[in-house]
C-alpha cells in the first residue's frame, strides 16, 4: 500500500505516474470526493467529541454543586448517539478509501526503466559461458524420464492432473540436495536464519504481503467448515516469512533481519494457459528456497544488491550460466519498487529463463502489515522496508542442472557442490 499522504497531497502527480509507469488508471474524482467526505466527517467527529467531553465536565461540576444533572445527562446521551452515527459514516468512508488503496500498485523507483513488458527489461550483466555441446542435446523432460527413477509426469497427471510430476530415485535425491545446498549456503555464509513456516495461511496474512485482494484467483483456497476461517496454500514462502513481523515494532539496531525458508509453493497459474505445458518450468506445486530481509528504511536499496548477490552465488557455485535483468515498469510485480530477475541458461530452449526474482518492496508491505522500527535514541517509529528473493526455485534449478550437465549417453554429471549431499555420487545414470 502506498503512502496515503501521497494520495491526499499529490493525487494528480501520483495518478499521472501510475498511468505512465504502471498502466494503472486511478479514479481521481472518486478519491477526491471520498477524501473531502473523510475530512468533513473527521472534523465533525472531533467537534462532537470535544462537546461531549465538555458536557461530561459540566456534569461533574453540576453534581459537585448539588444541581440537577438529568438535563445534562440527556444532552450527553443525545450527543453520544449523534457521535456514534457520524463515526459509523466515517468508518464507512475509511473502508472505501482502504479498499481503493489495496488495489493500487507500488510506485517504481526512479532508476527503474520505463517499458511496457519484458521485452524492455534492461540486461545488467552476464556470468558464465553457455556450454557448447558436440552431440545432440536432450531437454530435461527426455533426460528425466530416462534416468534411473527419474521424473514421472504421467504419474503426476494420474494423481493430480496437469502441471504435476513425481520424482524418484537419484533425481528426487538431487532435487532434495539442491534445496539443502541452498539453505546451507544462505544460513552458513549469508547470515540468514532458517525458518519453518505454515503452508496454509489466513487472509490477513495474504493481505499483508499483497496477494489479496488483487491475486485471489492465482491461489488455491480451502473451503472452510462452518465457523472456521478460510485458508489458502502459500504461493511463496515470502508470504508467511514476511508476515512474521506484522504488527511488530522492531529495534532499528537489530536490523537487518534475514530469514530463509524451503517450502513447496502452490499456484493456480490462472493466467498461464498454454504456456510451458511441458516439463517442470511451470507447475502448480514446486519447491523454492526463499530469502526475506527486513531492513532499516534508509538501507533497502543496498540490501537489494546484497540479496540479489546471494541468489547469484547459488548459480555461480553450481556453475550455471545466467544473466541479471533489471525489470522495466511494465514487467514489475504489483508490490515492488525495484526488481532484478536472474535468468539461467536452458540449453534445450537455447535461451535464458527466469530462476530468481529479487525485489525491494519499499514500505508497501510494511504499511499493510503495520511493521515498524524504532531506534533506542528516538521515540518515533518508522515503517520498515521489506525485500524478498528466490534463492532459488528448486525445480527450475534442477532443470538447468540436468540440461547443462547432461552427457551424450543421457546420463547427468552431478555438480561438485552437490556431491556431499548425494553420498559422493558423481553421475546419475540411466
UniProtKB/Swiss-Prot annotation:
This is Serine--tRNA ligase. ATP binds at residues 267-269, 354-357. Catalyzes the attachment of serine to tRNA(Ser). Is also able to aminoacylate tRNA(Sec) with serine, to form the misacylated tRNA L-seryl-tRNA(Sec), which will be further converted into selenocysteinyl-tRNA(Sec). Transmembrane segments: none annotated. Pathway: Aminoacyl-tRNA biosynthesis; selenocysteinyl-tRNA(Sec) biosynthesis; L-seryl-tRNA(Sec) from L-serine and tRNA(Sec): step 1/1. L-serine binds at residues 236-238, 290, 390. One of its GO terms (biological process) is seryl-tRNA aminoacylation. Its EC number is 6.1.1.11. Homodimer. The tRNA molecule binds across the dimer. GO terms for cellular component: cytoplasm. SUPFAM superfamilies: Class II aaRS and biotin synthetases, tRNA-binding arm. Keywords: Aminoacyl-tRNA synthetase, ATP-binding, Cytoplasm, Ligase, Nucleotide-binding, Protein biosynthesis. Coiled coil: none annotated. It is found in: Cytoplasm.
